[in-house]
Amino acid sequence: MSVEAYGPSSQTLTFLDTEETELLGADTQGSEYDFTDFTLPSQTQTQGHTQSQLDNQLNGPDDGLHNGGMDDSVAKASQLLAELNFEEDEEDTYYTKDLPVHACRSYCGIHDPACVVYCNTSKKWFCNGRGNTSGSHIVNHLVRAKCKEVTLHKDGPLGETVLECYNCGCRNVFLLGFIPAKADSVVVLLCRQPCASQSSLKDINWDSSQWQPLIQDRCFLSWLVKIPSEQEQLRARQITAQQINKLEELWKDNPCATLEDLEKPGVDEEPQHVLLRYEDAYQYQNIFGPLVKLEADYDKKLKESQTQDNITVRWDLGLNKKRIAYFTLPKTDSDMRLMQGDEICLRYKGDLAPLWKGIGHVIKVPDSYGDEIAIELRTSVGAPVEIPHNYQVDFVWKSTSFDRMQSALKTFAVDETSVSGYIYHKLLGHEVEDVTIKCQLPKRFTANGLPDLNHSQVYAVKTVLQRPLSLIQGPPGTGKTVTSATIVYHLSRQGNGPVLVCAPSNIAVDQLTEKIDKTGLKVVRLCAKSREAIESPVSFLALHNQISNMDSMPELQKLQQLKDETGELSSADEKRYRALKRTAERELLMNADVIWCTCVRAGDPRLAKMQFRSILIDESTQATEPKCIGPVELGAKQLILGEITASWSCVMCKKAAKAGLSQSLFERLVVLGIRPIRLQVQYRMHPALSAFPSNIFYEGSLQNGVTAGDRIKKGFDFQWPQPEKPMFFYVTQGQEEIASSGTSYLNRTEAANVEKITTRLLKAGAKPDQIGIITPYEGQRSYLVQYMQFSGSLHTKLYQVEIASVDAFQGREKDFIILSCVRANEHQGIGFLNDPRRLNVALTRAKYGVIIVGNPKALSKQPLWNNLLNNYKEQKVLVEGPLNNLRESLMQFSKPRKLVNTINPRFMSTAMYDAREALIPGSAYDRSNTGGRPSNMYFQTHDQIGMIGAAASHLAALNIPIPFNLVMPPMPPPSYQGQTNGPAAGRGAMKGKSGRGGRQRIQWFWEPGGWSHAKQSDQPGWGFPVILSGATDTGLHLHEPAFPDEPARTLPARALPWDSYLGDEFKSQIDVALSQDSTYQGERAYQHGGVTGLSQY
């Protein structure tokens, strides 16, 4: 076995036998462990004439004008200029024809053998220069193309070498690094894990602490691959990051594509962007339908490309007698996230048994305690359970969720019974008069079995019950789940049929279901068949489990028992079993008080013939708009959208996200002027922990429902730098590294410090399940899991703390939170940490204490983090040094910029360059006269380069980019609200939705005597008395004035979470806009280009 090393000559890579000790003493480096000086003179090839030669040709010798005369000189200069122009015309030909094979021809054209690297997967050469991008061209390509193996050029300083680990042969360049060894004359390439961390390295005199990655700051180390000089890069073809992104996308379908192909028509065609207002539901469907298809196509392509070979399987038998396969997948660079219930195809490809294939669904996903995945097979007939090796895993793509979204969009457009007229027009952005539902309000708003409500929660419940459309905003720890459950309780008690409650995720559904079950209502949890075997706290409420316990259908129970024991039924029994099961499902659903499901599950055929008057969608900002339409089109006449302020929807397809699919329905309605009701009292955080989030994200409106004394943990002995403030920022100087996937980051120094802090917390009395470690990067999460298990000083079981991403911690809490920031670089920015929503989530998860571990120098360049660091420094909790002797850091930061809001100076800037602001031309969010598109860096996508870093310069340099849905934004200026009453300006009268030939379908409706069915032509009415805007009999005015000091409110000002406006120029206009009256004359009638009235909503 030989090791790659620098031999006596610095011109070649020498392979040395480890036994030849006489060669190991050669000193080839001038400085200790410093290989950055190892560079060679570039083998520069002239590109055309040099500037000096051209100058000489144009000007001629000094005496040219005297000897040849003026005319001859001019003629000669003209001829040379013509030749020069001809050379410019041929510039593109130079890049395509005259470049050698090893040139970075796809990008810039640089072809110095010392500067280029060969991608073994794509079979293309790329240089190590940055050009106009934040990383080198080779690293840009490796990340975007998801490649990992490279070869150096044969004429380069190290010869033709495939970079690989000396110990295990790993060729993933994102894992590879080097260790100086044996008297500094040899460098050994080793992978980060596990080889570089093995203790056996000390036996051969290799110091693992000196391990450094081959790629730093998104460039290969200069001693390994030369970085082209600035002059060379200026002479090369200039290619932008945007062109690189488009070209890489094009290569997925056409590997031979060139930059010239980007100019062809149709290559970069963008879908139609979402609108703020829609003329009708047909336009709505025509815009969102293609975006849903884009997302579906991307998701399908992503899943079908995830095949993994050479998988080792561990077989087991479940309690239900079904086979379970356990296996671990290699670390992938995919955006795809495996979820419980996903389908996987497992194949045996070996020679020891017949070929076999089985389908199963995921019942266990990787977590903080291990990376093992478990699937439960539908049938295990023929499965080679005795053989552990040679398996292949395929991800099964199912179009169900996308099909249901498309179906919901179509139903919303063509079926008049799908939603009330009022909600229909409100969702489309039409100008309609606000209405109030006249209902019997409860004398006591607190629901049975739930905690008492505070003033803002009572106000929220009271207001929601009287409105057909409401938005609820719940900052962290303010009890939004309890408030939502209370609202559902009172809606169900009104006797208007079951209430449908949905959320984007199963976790959110389960949390809310658990609360409402305590009230004693009849609750049914509807879930996918693939999730029926997955345990949750509310499994007993699931429809399939309730059917199993129905005493009224003994025949069904017998058939179910027989099927569980034998695995299958005869044809006749199976037919009878399905019929009985459908009857039981229908009976349970129709007798339920509340039905719970995910937004996509609302399109389940079992709900197809039911309609729901009251629908609540929780955490609606986590769902795209088409997902929300699924529940809404089931007959919504009263719609409540709940929102956790730090949430966001995830759209994988970049094109769809840029077109606005990532914008939620909640956000668009806020932009349209529907004011959310905000809860104000938080019960989670120590007051010291809530101060910064309250002031920055919630305009100081959060009130503390707990005292500092309530948040002193008994039996916990931990020395905080400031005892009355259980928080600190631990200064760490480590450098970030690209993770093995190439699309994420890790920071080994931070990981070591996080382990030390965790150990101190455990020794101080905290339990593992009371500690949460948050990091924005999957690379750091995975590295921390392994580091804690193998390098922790305590028993491994004590390190079973939850380590997860910011997204995974949404809506949850821990006693103590440790935040690992990861980012530490000179050129790349701070990536995910730019997103204030993620910072808000991270800072608001803890009850008793928060510890941030990061590099202040890198973070302080971003305005929001600069504010945070200055805040911590002022409070003397910015510390450094050993944990047992922390001292205040002396680091200085620039003075934080003043936070300014152009409409409402009382609040901070709400500028975030995203779809929702760009939709309002001329508003505070529009930074151009043309309503230009926002910066791509703020679209919520999972683009790989976006994960690694964003451009350092953007329009938000003067403001902190707080997202729209983080704060309660000012209402759009009335001058925009009233521009000819909506999108039909200048078009005359609009056609209403009535009479548009919808399809007929049998539907079930709730009447006082119970469920009945009718066709859409004889659909019963709303059943609730409706009054126009004005004072209700309860004394609550629906149209509150814009200023809390005005006398129209009957509740105390502190109980009203609506924000005030200080802009006098908008006061009178807003009051007028909020008090317009009209007469309702028809179902969905329009008049003078706007909606004038609705008799049924």
UniProtKB/Swiss-Prot annotation:
Documented EC number(s): 3.6.4.12, 3.6.4.13
Reactions it catalyzes: ATP + H2O = ADP + phosphate + H(+)
GO MF term list: ATP binding; ATP hydrolysis activity; RNA binding; RNA helicase activity; zinc ion binding
Upf1 CH-rich domain: residues covered: 96-254
GO CC field: P-body
Keywords carried by this UniProt record: ATP-binding, Cytoplasm, Helicase, Hydrolase, Metal-binding, Nonsense-mediated mRNA decay, Nucleotide-binding, RNA-binding, Zinc, Zinc-finger
Keyword Protein transport: no
Enzyme class: hydrolase
Disordered as annotated region, ranges: 42-67, 977-998
Binding site for Zn(2+) 3: 165, 168, 191, 195
GO biological process assignments: nuclear-transcribed mRNA catabolic process, nonsense-mediated decay
Residues that hold Zn(2+) 1 according to the record: 104, 108, 127, 137
Annotated binding of ATP, by residue: 457, 474-481, 683, 813
CDD domains: 1B_UPF1-like, DEXXQc_UPF1, SF1_C_Upf1, ZBD_UPF1-like
Skewed-composition ranges (Low complexity): 42-53
Gene3D superfamilies tied to this protein: 2.40.30.230, 6.10.140.1240, P-loop containing nucleotide triphosphate hydrolases
Chain positions recorded as Zn(2+) 2 binding sites: 119, 122, 141, 147
Region ranges (C4): 165-195
Main location: cytoplasm
PANTHER family (UniProt xref): DNA2/NAM7 HELICASE FAMILY, REGULATOR OF NONSENSE TRANSCRIPTS 1
Primary role: RNA-dependent helicase required for nonsense-mediated decay (NMD) of aberrant mRNAs containing premature stop codons and modulates the expression level of normal mRNAs. The formation of an rent1-rent2-rent3 surveillance complex is believed to activate NMD.
Family: Belongs to the DNA2/NAM7 helicase family.
Full protein name: Putative regulator of nonsense transcripts 1
Gene: rent1
